[in-house]
Amino acid sequence: MARWPAPPPPPPPPPPLAAPPPPGASAKGPPARKLLFMCTLSLSVTYLCYSLLGGSGSLQFPLALQESPGAAAEPPPSPPPPSLLPTPVRLGAPSQPPAPPPLDNASHGEPPEPPEQPAAPGTDGWGLPSGGGGAQDAWLRTPLAPSEMITAQSALPEREAQESSTTDEDLAGRRAANGSSERGGAVSTPDYGEKKLPQALIIGVKKGGTRALLEAIRVHPDVRAVGVEPHFFDRNYEKGLEWYRNVMPKTLDGQITMEKTPSYFVTNEAPKRIHSMAKDIKLIVVVRNPVTRAISDYTQTLSKKPEIPTFEVLAFKNRTLGLIDASWSAIRIGIYALHLENWLQYFPLSQILFVSGERLIVDPAGEMAKVQDFLGLKRVVTEKHFYFNKTKGFPCLKKPEDSSAPRCLGKSKGRTHPRIDPDVIHRLRKFYKPFNLMFYQMTGQDFQWEQEEGDK
C-alpha cells in the first residue's frame, strides 16, 4: 500500500546573529529560499483578490478563461443601455411590467423616434377620459401588469356608470329629440333635463275646463306638464316632496313645470301645503257658471253610476222648502267665494289667475293669451292652434305646421246633459247669486253668470 509522503520538516530557525563574514565571503542569501517566499506571497494575494470579487456577485470572468486554449479571446461585453435595465422595484409597490425596449431605428437607417408626447387634454395616459384628478384617476393612469389590467378593465364600466350623469332616459330623450317628434298636438320636449317641483298649478275647478286649458298650454315649447292628475296636496301628501318631484317631467332651463289637479281648489289643507312648498308659485283657476258646472258634474257621475238618484233629488235637502243641499259636492264646489277666501290667507291675488271656462270655449286664443302673459311666456299659442268643432261645440287643437286632423278632447267632453227641471235651475241661480257677487268683488272680474242667456 502506498503511503503518504512524510511532511516536510519544519523550517529551521533563523540563524543567530553572527559575526560579519570573513573577508572574501558573499553577502547574498540562498537563492532557492527567496524564490519560494515570493511565489507564496503572490499566490496568496491573487487568491485574496478573487475571493473578494467573487463574494460581491459582480465577478465576470473573461471568455478567454472559459474557452478552449485554442480559441481567440474576445473583449468583455459592454454594459447594457439604461433603457434595457430592469426597472427597480420598491418593496410594497405594485408590480409593473418592464417597458419594452425601444426600436433601434438608427441601426436600420431610419430616423430616431421623437420623444413621447404628453397625453391629450382631458385624457389620461391610457387614452381614457380623465375625471379631473383624484386618487381614482391616478390609479387609472398608472401602467398596470397584465393581471392587474384585467381587473381594471372589468371595474371600469362600473366606475363610468357611477360617474356618468347620462342615463338611459337621457339617451332615449335625445334619440327622440333627433326626430323632433310631436305628440298630441303639443311639442314633445326631449326627455332629458332635470325633474323639478312645479312653478305653476292649475288648481281648479272640476268640470270648469281644466283639461282644455292644460292641453292648450302644453302646446307651448316652454311648458312641461304632467298628463295625469297627481293629487299630491289632497290624497298623496304623506308620500313626500321627493315622490311629487319624481312625478314631474324633466325640464330644461327656461321651461316651466306644471300640473293640474282640480280638487285642490276645494281642499282645505291644499293652500297651506302648497305655500310651504313654494311661496311664489303661480296658481290658475278655471271657473265656470256654478249651475252649469254642477249639472256637468252630475252628468259625469251619472255616466259611471247610472243607478244614482236624479239631479233634482240630490240638489235639495227639502225641495218643498227650497233648501239646497250645499253638502253635496256638485253644489259645494260652485261656492267659489268660500273656497277663494281660504286661498287668500296664504297667497296674494296677484299670484292667482282666474280663467273663464265659457270664454275658453268661444275665444280660446284670447284666454290663452292671458295665461301665457301670467306665466311670463311668449305668446306662442294663438288662434292658429285652434279649430272649432261644431259637432261637439268645443275648440280642438291643431298643428299649424302640417295638415293633420285637429285633435279634440275625449268623448266625455261635450256629452249631452240630462234635462233638468227649470224650477230647480231657477232655485240654484238664486242660491249662487250672493256667492257669485262676492266672488266678483274678490277677484275684480265680472263673469256675468247672472244673465239668463248664460244658463243653458
From Swiss-Prot:
It is a single-pass type II membrane protein. Residues 124-135 have a biased composition (Gly residues). This is Heparan sulfate glucosamine 3-O-sulfotransferase 4. InterPro entries: NST/OST, P-loop_NTPase, Sulfotransferase_dom. One of its GO terms (molecular function) is [heparan sulfate]-glucosamine 3-sulfotransferase activity. It is found in: Golgi apparatus membrane. Sulfotransferase that utilizes 3'-phospho-5'-adenylyl sulfate (PAPS) to catalyze the transfer of a sulfo group to an N-unsubstituted glucosamine linked to a 2-O-sulfo iduronic acid unit on heparan sulfate. Unlike 3-OST-1, does not convert non-anticoagulant heparan sulfate to anticoagulant heparan sulfate. 3'-phosphoadenylyl sulfate binds at residues 207-211, 288, 296, 413-417. Glycans are attached at residues 105, 178, 318, 389. Residues 1-34 are cytoplasmic. Substrate binds at residues 229-235, 260-263, 328-329. One of its GO terms (biological process) is heparan sulfate proteoglycan metabolic process. It holds the Pfam family Sulfotransfer_1. Belongs to the sulfotransferase 1 family. Brain-specific. It comes from Homo sapiens (Human). Its EC number is 2.8.2.23. It is an enzyme of class 2 (transferase). It catalyses: alpha-D-glucosaminyl-[heparan sulfate](n) + 3'-phosphoadenylyl sulfate = 3-sulfo-alpha-D-glucosaminyl-[heparan sulfate](n) + adenosine 3',5'-bisphosphate + H(+).
